[in-house]
């Protein structure tokens, strides 16, 4: 784990890479080296849920340090951070590859999609749109729309209209804690939402298989934490 100066008057705490050490083992020593004040956390390639980030925040607060921003290489970690209300930044995976690899042969990382975080319920007539992925902490009521160039993630009830992959991305997904929309769209495919009652406490995921939109229980890491 490393500490460096980020933006003016803000430290940056870097967790170790997964292959180097577990962050829980190295954190206590690093906490003793922190100066009171704002800090940015770089989670690198760790997949951290809301509980993990909440625990980190509490440990930092005890040292008089305020967490202001979270960087990560994994989208799942950024989703958890955004759900807690933190500004996020998708970091490039540099430094996690072999040091012996030539810079000429090292593949360039794929440019990450931006994650738009919005807190609040969308009501009839509202439309929330994002170029990349979108995470909504709230409900999408009937008559409201949510759309994204990438994934649509709703930490609540989706009962309006959702369009993922609006620019043609057939790999995009729609995830919600309760997926009962009036209409689903992924790329150019269109489907109506299911009419049966969802299983309590089970998030659902819509994805494209061929030309058909399939709905199934969401993978655990879609709403990690």
From Swiss-Prot:
Keywords: Cell cycle, Cell division, Septation. It comes from the Bacteria. The keyword Cell division applies. GO terms for biological process: cell morphogenesis; division septum assembly; regulation of cell septum assembly. SUPFAM superfamilies: Cell-division inhibitor MinC, C-terminal domain. Residues 91-108 have a biased composition (Polar residues). Residues 87-112 are annotated as: Disordered. Interacts with MinD and FtsZ. Belongs to the MinC family. HAMAP family: MinC. This is Probable septum site-determining protein MinC. It comes from Prochlorococcus marinus (strain MIT 9313).
